[in-house]
């Protein structure tokens, strides 16, 4: 079983953190985030680090212990540096473009797919076959990237579709005569 929860989360330079009951708040160069820790986990600030402990030794408390520590670590990294996910588009005629605040995707459908980018997330299209999703909330960045990928996930025969940068697509062999 993982013991990641035992390790206190150091507050990085340039980030101010506060613990108010079960709410951990972090403020940095990129913005401000807060996380509400579950009641089964005790949170305290000591010596420039946030430490978490389970209130009892139940399975639920111990599982939320490590998750809470990781979530607190993620909000510190988010307000300091931010998070980024890159997507690649492959396929003939498949491309992306920004149209105001919306992302317009041509993915082989009879219509253009228009994705409304949520607040707090920035989407950039450096090339027509590349999409870069950035933001301070790791969960939201991953969710937006997954929603964009879901429109046309990579298929196993030719590899066409939207995939994460560096993602390995398991290819299949086609029919044989």
Swiss-Prot record:
Domain of life: Bacteria
UniProt keyword Ribosomal protein, yes or no: yes
Keywords of this entry: Ribonucleoprotein, Ribosomal protein, RNA-binding, rRNA-binding
PANTHER family: 60S/50S RIBOSOMAL PROTEIN L6/L9 (PTHR11655), LARGE RIBOSOMAL SUBUNIT PROTEIN UL6M (PTHR11655:SF14)
GO biological process per UniProt: cytoplasmic translation
Entry function: This protein binds to the 23S rRNA, and is important in its secondary structure. It is located near the subunit interface in the base of the L7/L12 stalk, and near the tRNA binding site of the peptidyltransferase center.
Subunit (UniProt): Part of the 50S ribosomal subunit.
Family assignment from sequence similarity: Belongs to the universal ribosomal protein uL6 family.
Protein name, per record: Large ribosomal subunit protein uL6
GO terms for cellular component: cytosolic large ribosomal subunit
InterPro entries: Ribosomal_uL6-like, Ribosomal_uL6-like_a/b-dom_sf, Ribosomal_uL6_a/b-dom, Ribosomal_uL6_bac-type, Ribosomal_uL6_CS
